[in-house]
Amino acid sequence: MAEQSTKSVLFVCLGNICRSPIAEAVFRKLVTDQNISENWRVDSAATSGYEIGNPPDYRGQSCMKRHGIPMSHVARQITREDFATFDYILCMDESNLRDLNRKSNQVKTCKAKIELLGSYDPQKQLIIEDPYYGNDSDFETVYQQCVRCCRAFLEKAH
């Protein structure tokens, strides 16, 4: 019975070293703080294979440390199994969404609801821009967007 009440979310971006690990860490903290972490399976992944095996970008790690949010992740690429086992796959931009929809069409047993994480933003900022070529303030912007979106998503999905 407990198995049925477990929900799952996979956060996805291009390389799985900037945006999606931040979203994953933010969401983990939210469900931990609300004592519902045992009800959620949370992970993140990349649409590409560029960064597989790498840790999150050091600027993202610094940002999370400043906010007191633990972050430990190793970049991985999304798999066919992810589409069949996650309830939600939340991505960061239109390019991610196109890639995910294309990949999901190749999976017969896709059960995941694929959406932009930004679609949950109360401030209506639909796209979470890649901060890779930016600076610390760009990572802070991503963090703030992820906090708003993850809170709203949890409210709806809980």
Swiss-Prot record:
Pfam families the record matches: LMWPc (PF01451)
List of catalytic residues: C13, R19, D130
UniProt cross-references to SMART domains, sorted A to Z: LMWPc (SM00226)
Enzyme Commission designation: 3.1.3.48, 3.1.3.2
Keywords: Acetylation, Cytoplasm, Hydrolase, Phosphoprotein, Protein phosphatase
Reaction equation(s) it catalyzes: O-phospho-L-tyrosyl-[protein] + H2O = L-tyrosyl-[protein] + phosphate; a phosphate monoester + H2O = an alcohol + phosphate
UniProt modified residues of type Phosphotyrosine: Y132, Y133
InterPro entries membership: LMW_PTPase, Ptyr_pPase, Ptyr_pPase_sf, Tyr_Pase_low_mol_wt_mml, Tyr_phospatase_low_mol_wt
Cytoplasm as UniProt keyword: yes
Compartments, record wording: Cytoplasm
Modifications the protein undergoes after translation, according to the UniProt entry: Phosphorylated by LCK. Phosphorylation at Tyr-132 increases its phosphatase activity.
Subunit structure: Interacts with EPHA2; dephosphorylates EPHA2. Interacts with EPHB1. Interacts with the SH3 domain of SPTAN1.
PANTHER family per UniProt: LOW MOLECULAR WEIGHT PHOSPHOTYROSINE PROTEIN PHOSPHATASE, LOW MOLECULAR WEIGHT PROTEIN TYROSINE PHOSPHATASE
Family the UniProt entry places it in: Belongs to the low molecular weight phosphotyrosine protein phosphatase family.
Protein name (database record): Low molecular weight phosphotyrosine protein phosphatase
Native source organism of the sequence: Pongo abelii
